[in-house]
Regions:
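Extracellular lectin-like interaction modules
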Residues: 1-238
Length: 238
């Protein structure tokens, strides 16, 4: 599944060139809900099941009984613009029902960034080496488009050890500047997965084979090292 957004939302901000600076966060954490999986019915609890299914791994807590699940909910800011520049002291949750055209999205040091769009996520910066996304752990989702392009990858400048999760219906082109690219799970469903890193490309999972780290119709990697002798990357083609 590429699209984890099950509601269509009107944009919060519409413009040509949108710039937002926040002395806090952009988007918000909106509480949590706890469920017993054994008590959920596909006939009467569709919203709850969709909430669990669409949650990122780090938004889920599963109790030792294997039945109790807590979902931490997050609300993004939806923006429709030709160019988006965001800077926040804390985390950033950005969404959109059209293409998300990123100049710069910069969160606080080590803070999480989520960019989830109904279409594609693209680099619209005018400088070739401009860092588009700056922060900590990163989630990218392009439900019906690509992330970056062959001519203009999305440039990442993330904190040491920050993990990247990316899902795209088509292609993914990512360039990690100034360090390693830590791949939690990168899926280019119907296209090319192309990754460039100034440092190494390493798995973001604790155990090799725990999840598929890289998946696409074809995979291209340019990095100093690929994988680690203690934690191999898990790869799937097709």
């Amino acid at each position: 599944m590429v699209d984890t957004q099950y509601m269509i939302e009107d944009p919060n901000v519409v413009g040509k060139n949108v710039t937002i600076e926040a002395n806090g966060s952009i988007g918000q954490d909106t509480g949590s809900e706890t469920f017993k999986l054994s008590e959920l019915s596909p006939e009467t609890d569709v919203d709850k099941i969709l909430l669990i299914a669409s949650a990122e791994r780090d938004n889920l807590e599963i109790a030792e009984d294997g039945d109790t699940v807590t979902v931490h909910k997050r609300e993004d800011v939806d923006i429709h613009a030709d160019s988006i520049t965001l800077k926040a002291r804390d985390y950033i949750y950005l969404g959109g029902e059209e293409d998300i055209n990123v100049n710069t999205v910069e969160a606080g040091e080590g803070q999480k960034i989520t960019i989830a769009g109904a279409k594609g996520i693209y680099n619209v910066a005018t400088e070739a080496d401009h860092a588009n996304v700056i922060g900590g752990d990163l989630v990218l989702e392009a439900a019906d488009g690509s992330i970056g392009t062959e001519d203009k990858a999305l440039n990442l400048k993330l904190a040491d050890g920050a993990k990247v999760t990316a899902r795209s219906q088509n292609d993914i082109f990512l360039n990690s500047t100034g360090g390693d690219l830590v791949a939690e799970s990168l899926l280019a469903k119907d296209g090319v997965l192309s990754l460039t890193a100034d440092g190494s490309l390493i798995a973001g999972t604790l155990k090799e084979g725990e999840i598929v780290n890289l998946q696409g119709q074809s995979i291209v990697v340019n990095a100093e090292n690929v994988g680690d002798e203690d934690n191999y990357l898990t790869v799937a083609l097709g």
